[in-house]
C-alpha cells in the first residue's frame, strides 16, 4: 500500500537499528526532539505539511532541555508504552485467536488463487444485469398501457353510470349500525414481506382519490369503471415478475388505482392530500421538458387576496417542474424586474434548490404602481429566444405564464414581432380574482399563442387550473401516440404510503403516458393518465455484489443531470430530535458533491456523456461519522445502462481492492461447518434469491444456502461463486469455535472481566462470534447486530472494524472506543473494540482474507494501563514516578487524537485538542499529527436570520394589538373566501370535501437547512515513533512526551499539568459552515453544470386543435358572504394606518 491507514499506524516489527539521530536538545535554542522510524511514505507528502525544521524554528525557549527530560524521562515513558503495548497485544491475540486464524489461512495458501479484478469487465456485467432487470419493469408498464388504452377504446362514456368500487380510504369502514359504508365493502388485507410488511391484497387493486375530488363524479366513475380492466394485468405482471413492487395508474381526472390494494389513511385532519397528478413521475411522463418564464403582475390592483392567490399560483407551477425543466420569474408594474436579480437575462435549471429559492422570493413580493405588460412580454420572449439560439435550456417546449388580474389590450404587436406565425412559444394566461371585465383579452392572448386560459378566483381553484397547462403540453405527444418511457430521480414517496418502512426506501419510478385512441378526439390529444411502477434502488444495487468489490469498493448510479441515484455516501436523512427526516434536497445531490475530490469533474462529465472508461483518483474517505479518514487511491470504472438515463460506476481501491481471493473445498466438508451455531451471514447480501417464490421469503440466507447445497429445493437460485467462498471460509475458520470454547472453559473468575466477546469476519460476509461472558453481562448489545450498521456487513459497506484493520499492517491491532448512544443506553459502560487483518499472499499478490478481533470493557484496558505505568527502569527500590502522580498527566490516545484513557473519566472519548489545545497545537507544529480538511456538501445547518434586523424597536401594546387584529382578519377573510364558493365547486355531490393549500400562511421553518461545511480531521504520522517538547505558556513552560504503543494505533502522551496553558484555545474537531459572499453565491447559482437532455421532445404537432384553449369559470357565489371579505380588506389599511 502506498496510502491508507497503513501509513497512519506503526509497523508491528521491532524498531530496526537507526543511524544516529541529531540531538536537537543539545542546542539551547530548541526544546523538542523527534526520532524518525523511516523515511515518510510518498503518499503522505500531501498530508505532511510542516517540516521538522519549521517546528524547530517555532519552539525557541530558554528552559534547560536537561530539566525537561528529567521532569519526564523518555526512557521511563518508553518502558510504560512497551509494557502496556506488550500486555495488550498478548491479551487481544490470545482472545481473538488471530494467530491461529492466520495460520489456518497460511496452511491452505497452496490451494488458493488470487486473481486481479478486471474493473471494466465487472462494470459491464453489472450494467447488463441491471438493464435486464429494468427492462422487465418496462415490459410490465407497457402491458398496462396497452390494456388501459384498449379498455378506453371499448368504453362509451355514461353520464348516469352507477358503479361501486373499492375506495382505499373507505374499505372495511363501518357505520354506527355495523354495516359497511358506501364504497367501503369488505377488503381482505394481509401483511406481506415483499411490500414492507404492509397489509395488502395481491388479488385486486384499490382506488384512492384526493379529498377535493368527488368520488361519484361521472368522470371519476367512468374512469374507474374503464380501468377495472387493469386488475387482471396487475396480477399477471406480478406473477410473471415477482420482483415487481407497486404498480399503478394515475388518471388525468384525479383518481389513483394502485396494486396491490391497500388501506389509505387520511392525515390527522382527516384530509387526503395525495394527488397523483402532482407527482414527478406523472408530470415527467405527461410532458416533454420545458423552458418557462413566469410573468406576475405586481401593480397596485393586485393587492390583498389577489396577490395571495397569484403567489400560490406561482408556487403551484413551480411544483410541476423538474430537473429537466428551466425557469425564471419576472415581476412587473411600472417597470420590469427579475425577482432574483442574479438570474437576470437567463433561465436556470428547475432543480429543488432553485424552486425553493424562488418560492421564498415570491413570498416577499409587494404591490405598487401600474402594470405594463408589453415590456414584460418582450423581456420574456427575448430570454427564450436567446436561450434557444445558444442551444441552452431544455431545447424543447417554451412557454410564458402570464399571471394578472387583467389586460387592458391584446398586445398584438408584441406577438406579431416575437411569436407569429409559428407560435413557438405558448402563452398561458391566469386571470386572478372574480372580475371578468378583462377575461376576453386574457383568453385572446392564450388562444392566439397555442396556450390556455383559466380564471382563478380562490386558493382552492389553483391546483386544478394550473394542471391544465400540462394537458396542453402533452397534446403533441398524444396525437403522435409516442409512448416515451421515463425514469425518475431517486425519491422517498412518504406521501404514497404513511408507512415508515416505505417512506425511508429510496425508489425510482418507470412511467409511461396513456392516450385516448378514439378517432373523434384525436386532434384534441386527450391524455387519459400515466401508468407506473416503483423500483427499490436497494434491489437494483444488489446486482453489483458486494464481495466482488473488495473491502473499500462500491458501486453507484447517477442520472442524466449528474444527480446521485444511489451511492454509499448519499445521506438522504437527518435527525431532528428523535425523528429521522428526509433532507429537503436529498434527491438533487450532485455526483461532484459526493466524489468531491474530482475537482475537474472528469468522472461526472464522462458518466453524463454515457462513456465507458476508467480513471483514477487519490481520495480521502471519511469514516466513523467523520472522526477518521482513510487515504486511498481509487480506480473508477463506468458505463451507461442502456435505455435508461442512468450511468453506473464501480470503484476499486488500489492494493487489496485490486485482487479477489478464490478458495475451494468440498460441499460435504463445508456443509458440516456451516451448521455451527456461532456462524452467521451478511443479512443484506444475496447468497440465494429468496424474494421470488413466496415459500422462500421466510428463509434466512443461511437456511436458503443449506437447502440449495443439500438439493432439498431445486428451484432455489444461488450465487455459486459466493456460496463456494462461504464454504471455503467456513472450513478454514471452523477451528476458531473450538479455540474460543476452550478459552471460555478455562477462564477463571478474575479473567472473566477481560474480554466480552471475540469475533471474525471474512470477505465472503461470513461472521463468527463467541461470548466470554453471559449474554446479560455484554456491555454493547447492539454490536454485530443490524441495529449497529457500522459493525456488520451491509449492502454498501464492510464493517468499520474490518475496513480499519485492512489498512493497518496485518498482525497489529486497531483499537476503537465505543459507547452506546441514545438515551435508552445512558450509563452503559464504554467498551473498546480491537481488530486485526488476516492477509494471504500468493504469487506476490496479497489479499485480505478476513479480520478478527475482540470487544472488551474499557475498565480492563484502564487497569492494564495503570499497572504498566507503575513500572520503572530502576533495578533497586521503588519507582520514583508513576502516571498516577499528581504532577503527571497521562493519556492514551488513538491515531486520530481521541482519548481512550485519562485520569479524569469525563475526558474519555473526547478529542485531545478539546482537553489540551496547547499540546495538540505543538504536536501539529512538530509534524507528529497533521490536520486534514474535509468537506461535507450534504450537511444541515441552522439558518441565519437574514430577513430581519436583530435590533428591532420595542413593540408597543397598540402595535402588537393591531398586528394580531390584522392576522385574525386575514385568516377570517381567506377562510370565508375559500368556503364561499362551496356550492359552485362541487354542486354534483354534497359529500364532497375541499382541501385547501394554505401557502399564504407562513410555514414552520425547519430548524436546519442544507448547507456546505468543512471540518478538520487529525492524523498521526507513524514515521515519528517518539517525540518530546516544551510549550511556552507565558510565565511557565509545559513539558510533554509522546511515545508510540507497539502493535497498535495507540500513543502514550505524558504531560506536565502544573503549568497553566489556558492562553492556548482548544483545538476543536467541529464542522463550520462554508459561507459564500454575494458574488460567489451568484456565480454558483448561475452556473450551468453539464447535463444530458432527455432523448425525446414533443413540442408541436400540425394536427393539434389550438382552439381548445380554456374559458371563464363559473364564479357565482353568495353575495352576502363575498361582501364581508371585500369590506374587511377595505378596512384593513385604515385600521392599521
Swiss-Prot record:
Signal peptide (UniProt feature, chain positions): 1-19
- Where on this chain does a divalent metal cation bind? 297, 299, 301
Cytoplasmic-side segments: 1137
Xref: Gene3D superfamilies: PAS domain, von Willebrand factor, type A domain
The record's keywords, sorted A to Z, are: Calcium, Calcium channel, Calcium transport, Disulfide bond, Glycoprotein, Ion channel, Ion transport, Membrane, Metal-binding, Signal, Transmembrane, Transmembrane helix, Transport, Voltage-gated channel
* SUPFAM superfamilies the UniProt entry points to: vWA-like (SSF53300)
* Gene Ontology terms: biological process: calcium ion transmembrane transport; detection of light stimulus involved in visual perception
Molecular function terms, GO-annotated:
metal ion binding; voltage-gated calcium channel activity
Where is this protein found? Membrane
Entries under InterPro entries matching the protein: Ca_channel_alpha-2/delta, VDCC_a2/dsu, VWA_N, VWF_A, vWFA_dom_sf
Q: Which residues are glycosylated?
A: 201, 664
Q: How does it sit in the membrane?
A: Single-pass type I membrane protein
Tissues expressed in:
Predominantly expressed in certain types of endocrine cells. Present in the Paneth cells of the small intestine. Also present in the erythroblasts in the fetal liver, in the cells of the zona reticularis of the adrenal gland and in the basophils of the pituitary. Present at low level in some brain regions such as the cerebellum (at protein level).
Q: Which residues form the VWFA domain?
A: 291-473
Sequence motif: MIDAS-like motif, positions:
297-301
Q: What is known of its domains?
A: The MIDAS-like motif in the VWFA domain binds divalent metal cations and is required to promote trafficking of the alpha-1 (CACNA1) subunit to the plasma membrane by an integrin-like switch.
Additional information:
In contrast to CACNA2D1 and CACNA2D2, it does not bind gabapentin, an antiepileptic drug.
Tell me the protein family, please. Belongs to the calcium channel subunit alpha-2/delta family.
| Purpose of the protein | The alpha-2/delta subunit of voltage-dependent calcium channels regulates calcium current density and activation/inactivation kinetics of the calcium channel.
Q: Which disease is it linked to?
A: Retinal cone dystrophy 4: Characterized by minimal symptoms except for slowly progressive reduction in visual acuity.
According to UniProt, the name of this protein is: Voltage-dependent calcium channel subunit alpha-2/delta-4
Q: Can you name the source organism?
A: Homo sapiens (Human)
Q: Give the classification, highest ranks.
A: Eukaryota, Metazoa, Chordata, Craniata, Vertebrata
Q: Which gene encodes it?
A: CACNA2D4
